[in-house]
Structure formats: C-alpha cells, structure tokens
Amino acid sequence: IRSDVNFWIQTKRADSIQQRLPVDWNYGWENVTLCVTTENQRRADERLPILLDIPAKHKAFMIAPILSEAHVEKYLATNQFEQVLCDGENYDGDRPCYYEWIKSLHDQCKEYDVTFNFTGTGNVFVKDKKTYHIPKAYQRVQAQRSGLSYPS
C-alpha cells in the first residue's frame, strides 16, 4: 500500500471488514482509517462494537443519513474513535434531520474530545419546529454555518 496516500475505508458492512483486511494488517497501518456507517441507534449498537474489536490505528464512524437521535457515549468513551461524521438524507430522500439530534452528537463528541463533522443538513432539516427544504447545493453550506462541527 502506498505510504504517501491516506486511505479512508468506509462501509456499512462492519461484519465483513476483518476477513477483508490484508494478511500483514496486524494492528493497522498509519495511513488507513476504518469507518463504519450507521443510520440510527440500532445500527450503531450493531456495527460499532464490531469495529471496536478490529485492530486499527485510526477509526471513525458516520451517521448518515441520520434517521433518529443516537447516543454514542459508550463508544466515544473507548477512545478508539478519532472522528464522527453526520449527514441528513439527500438525493431523493425526504426523511427529516432534526437540529436536536445533531446538537446531541456535537455535545457527546465535545465531551469526549472527538472531532465531529456535520457534513450536510439533508433535504429536510427541522429546527425549532420549523421545517426547511434545502436544495442539495446548500446542504453542506448550511451545515457549516450551523456551528455544530467540533472543533469549530
């Protein structure tokens, strides 16, 4: 593997990671981050423990599209995750992303000093009981303007 390139390996199939790692993986490589995607609490509780059991120098997880509030404190407390990313549903989806869910993740990551990136609002964003329909071109910009990434 090229040591001059950083690789980000992302999957929702956490249970297949271990068997697909190279034979010389050992405790991971300095330039490879393993990332598992989840959508909600159920999937986080299903997939994150699997990633925790896999040796890797760098780990992250993404909640996208976020479909419900997620409490991930017990995973952050392991000190194995360097980054959490979150995004609302986009493309043809219309399931809402709630500001309160994002704020909760932000606060959890801040408490454990884990980088949090709110990468996009999704098509439907709800804040203060008001629903916003946000065109794809503005979803990332609106997420950045929210001030909910950590550190900001």
Sequence positions of predicted segments:
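Core AdoMet radical
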Residues: 1-20, 24-70, 81-97
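Auxiliary Fe-S-binding modules of radical SAM enzymes
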Residues: 67, 73-152
